[in-house]
Amino acid sequence: MAKGKFERSKPHVNVGTIGHVDHGKTTLTAALTTILAEKFGGQAKA
């Protein structure tokens, strides 16, 4: 069965974080992802 063409309906954004080890980069990224998912109706993936 052939797959249908994927239509990207939302803009794609790459975000980079730079910082020292154990200074909260992952925590900050997870918080931003969760807040934006709630605000714009998306789904945050772990």
Swiss-Prot record:
Example of a GO MF term: translation elongation factor activity
GO CC annotations, alphabetized: cytoplasm
Key word Lipid biosynthesis present: no
Gene3D superfamilies: P-loop containing nucleotide triphosphate hydrolases
The organism's place on the tree of life at top rank: Bacteria
Name of this chain's protein: Elongation factor Tu
Spans annotated as Disordered: 1-20
Record keyword Metal-binding present: no
Localization: Cytoplasm
Function (record text): This protein promotes the GTP-dependent binding of aminoacyl-tRNA to the A-site of ribosomes during protein biosynthesis.
Complexes and interactors: Monomer.
PANTHER family from the UniProt entry: ELONGATION FACTOR TU, MITOCHONDRIAL, ELONGATION FACTOR TU-RELATED
InterPro entries in the record: EF-Tu_GTPase, P-loop_NTPase, T_Tr_GTP-bd_dom
Basic and acidic residues bias locations: 1-10
Family: Belongs to the GTP-binding elongation factor family. EF-Tu/EF-1A subfamily.
A Pfam short name: GTP_EFTU
Organism in which the protein naturally occurs: Eikenella corrodens
Transmembrane segments: none
Binding residues annotated for GTP, in chain numbering: G19, H20, V21, D22, H23, G24, K25, T26
Keywords: Cytoplasm, Elongation factor, GTP-binding, Nucleotide-binding, Protein biosynthesis
